[in-house]
Each structure stands twice: as C-alpha cells, then as structure tokens.
Amino acid sequence: MAAALQRKCVLHWGSLDFYPNLYVVLVAPSGKARKGTAMIPGLKLLKEVGIKLASNSVTRQALIRDLKRSNETEIDPTTGSMDIHASLTVFSKEFTVFLGFHNNELMSDLTDWYDCDDDWEYRTKHEGIDDIKGVWVNIIGATTPDLIQSAMPLDAIGGGLTSRMIFVYEQRKGKTVHTPFYTDDEIALRQKLVYDLEKIRMLKGDFHVSKD
C-alpha cells in the first residue's frame, strides 16, 4: 500500500509532515522460513500496477540515479500548486547484499531518505553538486540474523538506520503448503487487490486524523 501511495499523500502533524514510506525487513534463519517466497506475490502485484522499483542489483550511484529518474510532477488538489516528487520502492530478497558490507555511505543515505526531505543534495562523480526534489524511499527486504550482524557495523545497531526499520522475525515456517495453487476464490480476490492498488495509487493530497 505504501508503494502505491508514494509521496503524493501526506499527514501534517504540527510542524511535522508524515509520508507513507516504510523500511520493513523480514528476518529468519537461513532455510527455516521462506522469506523471499513470501515476498514474490507482492512483487508481482507491484509490477502489475506499474510501481517504480529500484534495480535488482545496484551501487549507491545507480540507486541515486534510479531515484532521480523516478521523479514525477503532481498537482495538489487542495491548493492547485505543482509538486515534484521522486518516489522509489526498493524490493530486495537479499537485503544485506543490497546494503553491502559496512557500507556507511549508503546507510547514511537511506537514513536521510527516510525523512522524505523536500530537497536532498549529493556530490556527483565529477565533484559537482546535484539535488533531488521530494525524496521518498520505501523498502521491503529479507535477510538472516547472521547477515545483519556481518553487514552492519556495531554502532549502527539500535540507532540510525536500524531505528527506522521494522524487523519482522520468524523462527520457522508456520506450515508447509504441498499444493501452492490459487483457488478460484483466491484468483478473484487477487484481481480485487490489483483494482484496489490501482485506486490507491490515484490518491493524492492531505490526509487528516478523524475525530473518531
């Protein structure tokens, strides 16, 4: 849902603006739970709806390039003003490969992007300064406890990037599905999900907390 909403929707909360981006990482011991398998149906839905995704294997520079190329212009339905946003979803079944080993520069960028700054400046390969308007990054990834420890420096655990992440841990599979085929009802439900995501993707503007 966050991938469909992008940076087009916002909740103003006092002096703060909240956008619907999440950093979610599925964690389980290797071979004990099917993390990547659980993610595949979601990936297919996002591609079917046309959500912009980061490249599968990227360097920091390529990721920044993907983010910059994802920019779109939207008209605010409330004010009529023109807004530019660069919304990109990272979908990585091997999240620690995506992060790299102690890649402090990329981890610092991801920490910055979580806050969805209006302008994000960076130094280019040829030492120039460029910027991206309306940064918005959304992440769903998967890894193992051991790989988290090896990929991240100790001082990153519990603060910085990891404090912005939601780690979903599972020790083992809940059950084994011997015949993983959709029933007619599930196929119909999937089509409804695609329809809902397409409608959600069209939403834009300010959201408000209801009095209820």
Question: In which residue ranges do the predicted regions lie?
Answer:
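Phosphate-handling catalytic cores of nucleic-acid transaction enzymes
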Residues: 1-212
